[in-house]
């Protein structure tokens, strides 16, 4: 979605987003109200959104390479453009475990299979957290931090001669999605775990100014 941001800095650019799924932000758990907010703001920014379709063929230029071309989606939408970006097909970067004892824990999609304790399946003293795991949730920094706390607890138990007891339970989905410094929408969880939707003003206040770089710097004790 952030690929749409150049239209804010350079309003003369024509941006088209093609979403293969039937609706944008298809992750289970995201509210329709969130999607509606994002759709409306993309419209305000004159960004063309095509949902429920995909390119019938790839452009004749490499990703990020400048060159005029015309493509069509499988359901007939015509797109003229000068550059394209592939924002799909992410795969966990686990190639480095090939040929090691962890190879048997790698799923066909590249993710590492982990136990609820976050131990790699088949291993006692090897843990995995973050994007490489097969934990069924969106891959977020806060989720990786929460997983790290579970691993710390379990390693501490093992160092004390005890069995790992702490288990990781994915939280409900949430997202803070800025569309430039003044637009965006968010789905957050209140103290009771209920979802609430924030509009552009609140989203910009939380993340729009610096993409929360200052918050992360503070957490890491960086200047």
What are these regions (language model features)?
Residues 16-18, 50, 85, 127-129, ...:
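Hydrophobic/aromatic beta-strand patches that form the interior of the parallel beta-sheet core
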Residues 51-66:
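A conserved short coil-to-beta-strand element within the FAD-binding core of flavoproteins
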Residues 138, 147-223:
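C-terminal, flexible cofactor-proximal segment of oxidoreductases
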Residues 78-146:
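FAD-site-proximal beta/loop scaffold in flavoenzymes
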Residues 2-10, 61-64, 158-164:
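Alpha-helix termini
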């Amino acid at each position: 979605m952030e690929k749409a941001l150049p239209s804010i800095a350079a309003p003369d650019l024509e941006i088209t987003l093609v979403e293969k799924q039937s609706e944008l932000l298809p992750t289970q758990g995201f509210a329709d109200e969130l999607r509606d907010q994002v759709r409306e703001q993309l419209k305000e920014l004159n960004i063309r959104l095509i949902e429920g379709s995909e390119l019938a063929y790839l452009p004749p230029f490499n990703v990020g390479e400048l060159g005029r071309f015309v493509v069509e989606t499988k359901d007939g939408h015509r797109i003229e453009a000068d550059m394209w970006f592939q924002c799909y097909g992410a795969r966990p970067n686990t190639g480095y475990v090939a040929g090691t004892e962890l190879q048997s824990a790698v799923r066909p999609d590249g993710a590492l299979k982990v136990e609820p304790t976050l131990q790699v399946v088949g291993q006692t003293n090897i843990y995995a957290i973050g994007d490489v795991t097969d934990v069924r949730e969106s891959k977020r920094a806060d989720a990786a931090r929460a997983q790290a706390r579970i691993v710390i607890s379990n390693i501490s138990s093992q160092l004390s001669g005890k069995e790992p007891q702490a288990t990781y339970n994915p939280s409900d989905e949430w997202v803070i999605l800025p569309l430039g410094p003044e637009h965006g929408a968010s789905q957050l969880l209140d103290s009771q775990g209920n979802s609430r939707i924030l509009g552009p003003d609140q989203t910009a206040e939380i993340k729009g100014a610096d993409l929360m770089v200052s918050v992360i710097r503070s957490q890491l004790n960086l200047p």
